């Protein structure tokens, strides 16, 4: 999405998928000058982040949460009350529209020369995506 979402728009129009899962980073808020009361509480090393909000198809979001719980996958929830600014937003509104979900890796100091992520979070995301690919999703 950093370059105008050209790739996701082209892919969505060409493939016309039933579902789309955007994978991105999100701001970790576990550093000294950040207020969790103002910015929410997202921690590096505490698991993959599952977004909830208007860009997220509710059934797909619930399925991801259920799979994380059933398989002991570490996760965090990030409420997003507006369009996400990620590929999930562009998939949702391109062409006929696509049911979307968003998984994010917590990133401390995003958009600086010293970004920090945890392989724990990356691996939890890989596990969740693997389980998601193994289940039948209802396309109603």
Describe each region flagged by the PLM.
Residues 42-122, 126, 132-137:
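Active-site-adjacent substrate-binding region
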């Amino acid at each position: 999405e950093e370059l105008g979402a050209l790739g996701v728009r082209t892919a969505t129009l060409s493939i016309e998928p039933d579902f789309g899962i955007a994978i991105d980073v999100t701001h970790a808020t576990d550093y000294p000058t950040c207020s969790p009361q103002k910015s929410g509480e997202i921690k590096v090393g505490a698991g993959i982040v599952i977004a909830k909000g208007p860009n997220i198809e509710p059934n797909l979001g619930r399925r991801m949460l259920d799979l994380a719980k059933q398989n002991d996958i570490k996760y965090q929830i990030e409420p997003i009350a507006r369009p996400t600014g990620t590929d999930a937003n562009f998939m949702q509104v391109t062409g006929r529209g696509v049911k979307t979900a968003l998984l994010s890796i917590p990133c401390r100091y995003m958009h600086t020369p010293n970004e920090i992520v945890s392989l724990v979070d990356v691996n939890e995301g890989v596990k969740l995506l693997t389980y998601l690919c193994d289940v039948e999703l209802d396309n109603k």
